[in-house]
Amino acid sequence: MTAPEQTYRNKKQRKQQHKLRRPGYAIAKYVRMSPRKVRLVVDVIRGKSVAEAEDLLRFIPRAASEPVAKVLKSAKSNAINNDEMLEDRLVVAAAYVDAGPTLKRLLPRARGSANIIKKRTSHITIIVAERESLSRKGS
């Protein structure tokens, strides 16, 4: 087997293992919103049950709650359909926001100068998992 074939097989195996490690996840990339503003919303739902997180997102008066709700809905659907998890036992195991590429625009100013306006983007990642059974009172 030649070296390129070996590398391809390793990449493919690595990708499959990577998928196995993260059941019930969803990512929204290049969301045209500042990561700082999206983190305010994501911090509220982290660790909550999925049903409670959906209710919270419905009433949070921030623009970032809409894309976060979409990602949460997608992660929930992935967990139920692809990973065969139970809907009523799902919790938000991890939720984080990374900065995407920044679009730079010029704003003309006085005397021929210009300021740079940074239009920031975000990558929103939400991972849901099943809640551990809490019926271990006897042990």
Swiss-Prot record:
This chain is encoded by the gene named rplV
Functional note: This protein binds specifically to 23S rRNA; its binding is stimulated by other ribosomal proteins, e.g. L4, L17, and L20. It is important during the early stages of 50S assembly. It makes multiple contacts with different domains of the 23S rRNA in the assembled 50S subunit and ribosome. The globular domain of the protein is located near the polypeptide exit tunnel on the outside of the subunit, while an extended beta-hairpin is found that lines the wall of the exit tunnel in the center of the 70S ribosome.
Q: Identify the keywords attached in UniProt to this record, alphabetized.
A: Ribonucleoprotein, Ribosomal protein, RNA-binding, rRNA-binding
Highest taxon of source: Bacteria
Q: CDD domains from the entry? A: Ribosomal_L22
What protein family does this chain belong to? Belongs to the universal ribosomal protein uL22 family.
Q: Which organism is it from?
A: Deinococcus geothermalis (strain DSM 11300 / CIP 105573 / AG-3a)
* The protein's name: Large ribosomal subunit protein uL22
One GO MF term on file is:
structural constituent of ribosome
Locate the compositionally biased regions of type Basic residues. 9-21
A Gene Ontology BP annotation from the UniProt entry:
translation
Question: What do the Gene Ontology cellular component annotations say?
Answer: cytosolic large ribosomal subunit
- Region described as Disordered: spans on this chain: 1-21
* Assembly notes: Part of the 50S ribosomal subunit.
